[in-house]
């Protein structure tokens, strides 16, 4: 196996000897240029919720517990000073929990690296981890994919969110809360598969 740094070293050595064509062949063969293709799309709350539930609200790259997005938003509504929210994600004005604990969908194999935009290539991770991973592969980052979480042990507070909105229905006046609440109910079938025993909140 030729390390990428070794390929560069060899190419530089060949250049010093005036062997430009050979240097080019080394790069073409050992460390070729592959243009990154930008590929980004928005996912519906339902698509995201299904992935979050399937992965057990666990960051599949770090193994940390994550929180159902509207549960964090609801927390900010009740505790605006202690857990501030910013609609544009301004880090100087929003709680760090919106990056550390907020789940999103990531492409296991980045679209820019030839990955497919399909469920088999989707995993749950935090906004923070998603930002770090960017268009890199797990091999390049020397990361490993963590096992899915156990929904019986951790449900991302999705049950708390549903129950709290049911007990405080005025929160449905907030369009974000209303949209995600409907999504949670629409995904009841996915949730029910994991609720045959007690679930911690």
Tell me what each language-model feature is.
Residues 141-144:
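Domain-level detector of nuclease and nuclease-like folds
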Residues 45-102, 126:
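Short cysteine-rich loop/turn motifs with clustered Cys
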Residues 69-72, 134-138:
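Short Cys/His-rich "knuckle" micro-motifs
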Residues 163-201:
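Short flanking/linker segments adjacent to small metal-binding domains or redox-active Cys/His motifs
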Residues 87-104, 110, 152-176:
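Short Fe-S-cluster ligation motifs
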Residues 66, 129-133, 149:
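A generic secondary-structure signal for well-formed alpha-helical elements
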Residues 56-59, 98-106, 110-131:
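Short beta-strand-alpha-helix junction that forms the catalytic/metal-binding core
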Residues 1-50, 56, 63-69, 199-201:
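A boundary/linker detector
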């Amino acid at each position: 196996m030729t390390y990428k740094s070794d390929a560069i070293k060899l190419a530089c050595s060949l250049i010093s000897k005036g062997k430009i064509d050979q240097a080019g062949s080394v790069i073409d063969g050992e460390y070729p240029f592959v243009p990154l293709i930008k590929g980004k799309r928005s996912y519906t709350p339902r698509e995201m919720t299904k992935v979050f539930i399937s992965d057990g609200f666990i960051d599949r790259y770090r193994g940390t517990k994550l929180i159902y997005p509207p549960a964090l938003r609801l927390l900010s509504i009740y505790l605006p000073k202690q857990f501030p929210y910013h609609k544009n994600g301004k880090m100087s004005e929003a709680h760090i929990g919106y990056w550390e604990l907020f789940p999103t969908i990531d492409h296991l194999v980045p679209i820019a690296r030839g990955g497919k935009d399909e469920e088999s290539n989707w995993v749950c991770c935090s906004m923070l981890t998603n930002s770090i991973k960017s268009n890199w592969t797990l091999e390049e980052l020397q990361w490993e994919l963590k096992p899915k979480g156990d929904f019986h042990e951790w449900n991302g507070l999705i049950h708390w969110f549903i129950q709290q909105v049911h007990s405080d229905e005025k929160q449905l006046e907030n369009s974000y809360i209303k949209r995600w609440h409907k999504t949670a109910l629409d995904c009841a079938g996915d949730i029910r598969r994991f609720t045959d025993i007690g679930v911690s909140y």
